[in-house]
Every structure is written in C-alpha cells, then in structure tokens.
UniProtKB/Swiss-Prot annotation:
Membrane-spanning parts: none
Family classification: Belongs to the universal ribosomal protein uS2 family.
GO biological process: translation
Biased composition (Basic and acidic residues): 290-303
A Pfam family of this chain: Ribosomal_S2
PANTHER family on file: 30S RIBOSOMAL PROTEIN S2 PROKARYOTIC AND ORGANELLAR, SMALL RIBOSOMAL SUBUNIT PROTEIN US2M
GN (gene name): rpsB
Disordered: region residues: 273-324
GO terms for MF: structural constituent of ribosome
Name listed for the protein in its UniProt record: Small ribosomal subunit protein uS2
Length: 324
C-alpha cells in the first residue's frame, strides 16, 4: 500500500480547499479551518481516508479487478493519463460520454467503428474516395480516438472507478452508482461525498495535488497485482559439499561395479584368472600357435646343420712350369 507523507501533501498543496462561499456542508467533517476566505482541509483526515482507499484498491487489484480512471478537467488530464498507463488501468481524460457505463454495448459498437475507420486509413481507402468524404471520415476517426482511446481495450465494465473531482465528472459517478460499481474519488470542499464509497478529501484543482493522488492509487494497483503474482523463486543452488559428496559416491560405486561385475558374455571361469595371467582371444591364440611352429621348425633346421659332417676339400695341386 502506498504511503504518502504529510510533508509531501503540504508541498503539493493538498490542504487547500475552495472559497468558503462555495463549500458543501457535507464536507465539513474534513475541514480544519479557514484562511483568507479559503477552507483548509485537515491533512490528518486526508491521510486516514487515503490509506483506507488505497488499501481497498490494493485488495481489489489482488483479485484481478479492472480499474477505470476518470478526470476530464484540464489540469488533471496529463497526470491521470500517465498514471493510468503506468498501472494498466483504463482512462477517460477528455469528455465523459453519457451512457459509457450504463449503455456499454453502444460504446463497444463505437469502438468497432473506430477500428473500422483506422483499417480503411491503413488500406488506403481514404485516398480512393472523394476529398469531402475522406475529410468527414477522418474527423470522425479523430473524434472517436479522442473520446474512446483510453477505453478501446475495455471489453467489459470496470470493477472500480477512480475519479478526480466528482463535481466535474458527476455523470461517471451517477452511472457507477446505478451499476453498483465502487467509486474512489478525490473530493474538494465543494463536493458531495454521500455517493462516494471511498472519498479522499483533498485539493482537486492543483496539478501537483492531482498527480500525488493518481500516483498513490497507481502504486496500490501495481503492489496488489505484484503480490497476487507472488515472488519469483530464485533457482536453488546445490551446496558445494553436497556436490562433492555426490561425485565421490558415484566414483566409488563405479569402481566397485568394475571390480565385482561379471560380463554377461563370459563365463565365471573365463573371468576369474590367476593374477598376472594373460588372456588371449581365439584369433590371437591361432596366430600365436603358428608363430610357435615356425620357431620350432627353424630350430630343427639349425640343429640338423650342426649334426651334418663337414667334408674338407683337398687342396688344389700347384701347377709346375716345365723348363725348356
């Protein structure tokens, strides 16, 4: 829930009301006094009512409620549009069309008409017709964009209506009351708080005061939706010691498996060999036998050569030359 300090409200001029001649006696419970012909609001009561209103808004936001911001006076337009956009609320900041809530089906048809005109413009239809007709359709499109731009995505009635100055936008308040839609409103000293579910006594003419209230409501909506989504759980990291123990256990298990396990293809007799024994495969055994026969044959030949008697040749006779 958004908390607004007394200092912030004083700096924004929240405590300034209307002239004493323009007050509504029903707002008397929220008035602190009078100064220079102007009523001064009790900021302690303002803080209390603002806290109640934002608590309600936050709870509704948790439930997935849809909000409509309404503020059509010039000094409220910028603040109410920007804050509604920030918190994802619908907004009407130009003019309240009678029947926006009570005749919502007609409003939906107007939105469909707006979508159709924008489609024609994209497809170049305006260029294919007369300039007079194109101008007429263009003006109609701009008018609908201005009036319905902030609610064109609103497929059903809102769950809560937030109003700046219920006197200026009394049409919105009346329609919300008829449809039993809760109303939260910033009420100056000239307002009637009876039809407001959550009245917030405050200055509804100063731009800074309006900005403060709009921001507080938007913050409450964002907080409620964030809490409804729940905090994001960070990925849990496995402790280093646990990882090390797991690796050691796997390594030990693998070593034991290699030492004890008997391959399915071999018999126990083939697997269990004396220490230091050399295991020879079938092909290697034949090759080794051939090599052994070859060595034995060579050895026999050598022995035969040794046993064979050696015959010495007689020396050649020397040739004697005859003497003539």
């Amino acid at each position: 829930m958004s908390n607004v300090s007394m200092k912030a409200m004083l700096e924004a001029g929240v405590h300034f009301g209307h002239q004493t001649s323009r007050w509504n006696p029903k707002m008397g419970q929220y008035i602190f006094g009078e100064r220079n012909g102007v009523h001064i609001l009790d900021l302690q009561k303002t803080a209390k009512e603002l806290k109640k209103a934002t608590a309600f808004i936050k709870e509704e936001a948790k439930k997935g409620a849809r909000f409509l911001f309404v503020g059509t006076k010039k000094q409220a337009q910028e603040a109410i549009k920007s804050e509604a956009e920030r918190c994802g609320a619908y907004v009407i900041s130009e003019k309240w069309l009678g029947g926006t809530l009570t005749n919502f089906q007609t409003v939906k048809k107007s939105v469909e008409r707006l979508n159709e005109l924008e489609k024609w413009e994209r497809e170049g239809v305006f260029k294919a017709i007369s300039k007079k007709e194109a101008s007429r359709l263009g003006k109609e499109m701009v008018r609908l964009q201005t009036l319905l731009g902030g609610i064109r995505e609103m497929k059903s009635l809102p769950d809560v209506v937030f109003v700046i100055d219920p006197v200026d936008t009394q049409g919105a308040v009346k329609e919300a009351v008829i449809l039993n839609i809760p109303v939260v409103a910033v009420c100056d000293t000239n307002a009637d708080p009876d039809n407001i579910d959550y009245p917030i006594p405050g200055n509804d003419d100063a731009a800074r005061s309006i900005k403060l209230f709009c921001a507080a409501v938007a913050d409450s909506i964002i907080e409620g939706r964030t809490e409804a989504e729940g905090p994001k759980q960070p990925a849990q990291e496995t402790p280093a010691a646990e990882v090390e123990n797991t690796i050691m256990a796997q390594a030990l298990e693998g070593a034991l498996t290699e030492e004890v396990a008997v391959p399915a293809e071999k018999t126990v007799e083939e697997t269990v060999k004396p220490e230091g024994a050399v295991v020879i495969e079938e092909g290697e055994e034949i090759e080794e036998e051939e090599k052994l026969h070859g060595r034995e044959e060579k050895k026999a030949k050598k022995e035969a050569v040794k046993k064979k008697p050696v015959v010495k040749k007689a020396p050649k006779a020397k040739k004697v030359e005859s003497a003539d």
